[in-house]
Amino acid sequence: MGLWYDETLDDHTRLGLRVKETLFSGRSSYQHIEVIDTVGFGRVLIVDKVFMTSEYDEFLYHEMLAQPALSTAPNIARVLVIGGGDGGTVREVLRHSDVKDCVMVEIDEMVVDVSKEYLHGIGTAWNDPRLDLRFIDGHEYVKRSNDEKYDVILIDGTDPVGPGAVLFDESFYAGCKRMLTPEGVMALQSESPLLMMDLFVETQHRLRRLFSEVHPYLGPVPLYGTGIWSWTWCSDTGEPLRAIRERQEAIVEGSKAYNEELHQAVFALPNYVKRALKL
């Protein structure tokens, strides 16, 4: 049967991928990083034994994290990406010509180096002159920033363990809100509403204490075990369904998943999520 790589999702569930070859395995100052080439998902980035992204389905995650916010914010000249060392989120940001400055804050330089070396199809915007890449802890960056303002903030964090755990703190979200322009939009990955429902609900509560408009939305990401994933759109103004058509039209042709119809559909929540959130 060959070699398989398993990620343990909980005490009762594992996801396994059949491996063709291990391309990289090493430890940074923060975490263990691997890249494997698989039969079904192509090249896969793994951090501390957790699947992060794959060539096969990364677009489902990165497009849905970035494009709903970028299509609804009144202005997108300045964008902050926190995390996202594989390069997929900044790729999506820099598809927009209206973006003049994209700051990416990543704690682990090795993740970026490994992604540049082995995940060429995901991180295609590393050489864009609008990208300002800074290697610093995202929580510390937000805490220290006094007067920097952004039109859009995208939080592309890992699961709430290891160095990514602080990206789920309410104090971190409050700091991000302080850095937003008055009409700014923040979007973040907010875990699975199946396997991690308690964390999903608590994240929504934390965000609701800070923002007037908090709207979770759902989509499929097969690599993440449960098959369904969530992101959350946040702002003090605006409405997530009121997209700027011209901005959408400019990027839809080059998108694998995102389009005008999908934008409307993903914000429709199933009953079990509505009940959990008491909507």
For the regions a language model picked out, list residue spans one by one.
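SAM/dcSAM-binding transferase cores
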Residues: M1-E34, H205, T226-L279
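The AdoMet/dcAdoMet-binding core of the Class I SAM-like
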Residues: G2-W4, S28, T53-V185, L195-L199, ...
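A general beta-strand register signal
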Residues: I46-V47
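N-terminal glycine-rich anion-binding loops that anchor highly charged ligand groups
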Residues: I33-R43
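A short, structural micro-pattern
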Residues: V39, E106, G225-I228
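Glycine-centered loop/turn positions within well-structured domains
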Residues: R43, E140, E239-L241
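C-terminal substrate-binding/active-site "lid" region of AdoMet-derived donor-dependent transferases
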Residues: G164-P240
